[in-house]
């Protein structure tokens, strides 16, 4: 009799688990229809896209080129004045954003992996003035410290806050994962600086002798998505987990986001990371996470009027599955997820001035795709 009860209980638990799992997966169909139009092609590993006031697009290519592309898809010659990058592994010319005061300054801000000698390199951020066919008056405003002998996990996304300060995401460079938990370096951190690279008031560790003053939050792995929520005005980021455990976070001043102490992922090939914890006191939980990994890259909040059904949604690119991921939000929570099949590695996601989404595909013949609901 006891054995029968145990078997019945096990069967009921298995059925319940299957139902819960199925309901969760129902929010994540393998594909859904989109109208997809190719705008441009012939880009080598494009990494980031920014819209200029005239509607043209400024695009970075990882080998170290920056181009201007018009609405018909015509590619300019590479702009002169781009600094030399360390094009190796995951490194190269990476993110680009416009100065919030671009109309008066003509400044663009961009990130790249910079050689530091002795086979070391680091995430570097600079600004320059955009002339017709070149960058002028370049100034470096941030250099990741310390430099590392690694070609992985540069992070490198940039986002301007409403107060004009600049958030920079920095990966832990893979070989420095334990340093994501210490405050005397920039590895595995979100950094906050002024437009000139100075330390703004309100940085949580400013004035501490054991911490770098530019730090905003810590315990990150490799954040390759960053955007300001236009409704809450908060910074949102996403980061790559190891094998599983990609995360979306809302980094707050001075908070610890756990890597590599807590994670929903595991070692490549299987096995615990550290003690195998996913929760620990004093460490923040993600807003959303993915197991298995989707390899997120690029993110954009939809705050345009062309497609009302998308209003208030967050869109994230997927390198691993060739998807565009739509997240429906309620406040600071993710309520549901939908996946659109793009068929290519999606490196960046931006909302265009026309209300369409624009995607960059990560490939040797990279494309700009314009997408909307069908």
Over which residues does each language-model region extend?
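Hydrophobic helical h-region of N-terminal Sec-dependent signal peptides
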Residues: 9-17
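Conserved blade-ending motifs and adjacent loop-strand segments that build the rim/top face
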Residues: 220, 333-353
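Surface-exposed loop and turn segments in beta-propeller and other repeat-based domains
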Residues: 77-91, 138-154, 195-216, 260-291
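Internal hydrophobic scaffold segments of catalytic domains
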Residues: 180, 231-264
């Amino acid at each position: 009799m006891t054995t029968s009860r145990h078997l019945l209980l096990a069967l009921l638990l298995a059925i319940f688990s299957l139902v819960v799992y199925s309901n969760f997966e129902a929010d994540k169909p393998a594909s859904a229809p989109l109208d997809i139009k190719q705008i441009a092609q012939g880009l080598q590993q494009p990494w980031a896209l920014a819209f200029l006031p005239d509607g043209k697009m400024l695009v970075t290519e990882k080998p170290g080129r920056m181009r201007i592309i018009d609405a018909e898809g015509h590619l300019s010659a590479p702009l002169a004045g781009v600094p030399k990058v360390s094009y190796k592994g995951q490194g190269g010319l990476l993110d680009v954003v416009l100065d919030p005061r671009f109309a008066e300054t003509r400044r663009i801000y961009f990130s790249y992996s910079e050689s530091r000698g002795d086979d070391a390199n680091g995430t570097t951020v600079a600004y320059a003035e955009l002339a017709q066919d070149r960058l002028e008056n370049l100034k470096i405003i941030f250099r990741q410290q310390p430099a590392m002998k690694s070609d992985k996990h540069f992070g490198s996304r940039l986002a301007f806050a409403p107060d004009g300060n600049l958030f920079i995401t920095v990966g832990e460079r893979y070989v420095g994962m334990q340093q994501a938990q210490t405050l005397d370096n920039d590895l595995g951190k979100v950094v906050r600086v002024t437009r000139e690279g100075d330390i703004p008031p309100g940085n949580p560790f400013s004035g501490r002798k054991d911490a770098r003053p530019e730090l905003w939050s810590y315990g990150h792995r490799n954040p390759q998505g960053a955007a300001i929520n236009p409704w809450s005005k908060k910074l949102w980021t996403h980061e790559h987990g190891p094998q599983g455990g990609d995360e979306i976070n809302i980094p707050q001043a001075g908070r610890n986001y756990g890597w590599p102490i807590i994670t929903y992922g595991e070692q490549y090939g299987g096995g615990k990371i550290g003690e195998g914890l996913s929760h620990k006191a004093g460490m923040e939980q993600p807003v959303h996470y993915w197991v298995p990994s989707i390899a997120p890259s690029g993110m954009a909040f939809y705050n345009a009027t062309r497609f009302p059904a998308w209003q208030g949604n967050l869109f994230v690119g997927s390198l691993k599955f060739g998807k565009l991921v739509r997240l429906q939000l309620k406040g600071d929570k993710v309520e549901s997820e939908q996946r659109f099949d793009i068929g290519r590695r999606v490196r960046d996601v931006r909302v265009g001035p026309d209300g369409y989404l624009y995607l960059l595909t990560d490939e040797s013949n990279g494309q700009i795709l314009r997408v909307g609901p069908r």
